Amino acid sequence: MSGRGKQGGKARAKAKTRSSRAGLQFPVGRVHRLLRKGNYSERVGAGAPVYLAAVLEYLTAEILELAGNAARDNKKTRIIPRHLQLAIRNDEELNKLLGRVTIAQGGVLPNIQAVLLPKKTESHHKAK
């Protein structure tokens, strides 16, 4: 008999992370571990960490996109906490979600009450 059956088992396939399977950048395995260790429930389904990682990734991308726009509006190439603050507070839905959140070094939105603004006086100078 020739060497049939002596090739051994199949070569182990290259490991593929659950994040790459789901097409995500956020770590599905780490989210799963944190859900298990966090005493949220006795058991954690396989889809829960994937869904949660996807939601976190989406929210992060949304905030970073708006903060990048705020940085570009201020002619800066680096996002600072001020840009995050401006991005969140100028977006209605993000502001509602993060309404009670304080961003360190974020400052406040520029806002001057209308009553405090100088009155526009209509002075008509009649040339005679």
Curated annotation (Swiss-Prot):
Modified residues (Symmetric dimethylarginine): 4
Chain positions covered by the region annotation Disordered: 1-22
Span of the signal peptide: none
Modification type Phosphothreonine: residues: 121
Entry-annotated residues carrying N-acetylserine: 2
Modified residues (N6-lactoyllysine): 10
Pfam families: Histone, Histone_H2A_C
Post-translational modification: Deiminated on Arg-4 in granulocytes upon calcium entry. Monoubiquitination of Lys-120 (H2AK119Ub) by RING1, TRIM37 and RNF2/RING2 complex gives a specific tag for epigenetic transcriptional repression and participates in X chromosome inactivation of female mammals. It is involved in the initiation of both imprinted and random X inactivation. Ubiquitinated H2A is enriched in inactive X chromosome chromatin. Ubiquitination of H2A functions downstream of methylation of 'Lys-27' of histone H3 (H3K27me). H2AK119Ub by RNF2/RING2 can also be induced by ultraviolet and may be involved in DNA repair.
Keyword Nucleus attached: yes
Modified residues (N6-glutaryllysine): 96, 119-120, 126
Modified residues (N6-crotonyllysine): 37, 119-120, 126
Protein name: Histone H2A type 1-H
N6-succinyllysine PTM positions: 10, 96
Crosslinked residue numbers (Glycyl lysine isopeptide (Lys-Gly) (interchain with G-Cter in ubiquitin)): 14, 16, 120
Localization per record: Nucleus; Chromosome
Primary role: Core component of nucleosome. Nucleosomes wrap and compact DNA into chromatin, limiting DNA accessibility to the cellular machineries which require DNA as a template. Histones thereby play a central role in transcription regulation, DNA repair, DNA replication and chromosomal stability. DNA accessibility is regulated via a complex set of post-translational modifications of histones, also called histone code, and nucleosome remodeling.
GO MF terms held by the record: DNA binding; protein heterodimerization activity; structural constituent of chromatin
Modified residues (N6-(beta-hydroxybutyryl)lysine): 6, 37, 120, 126
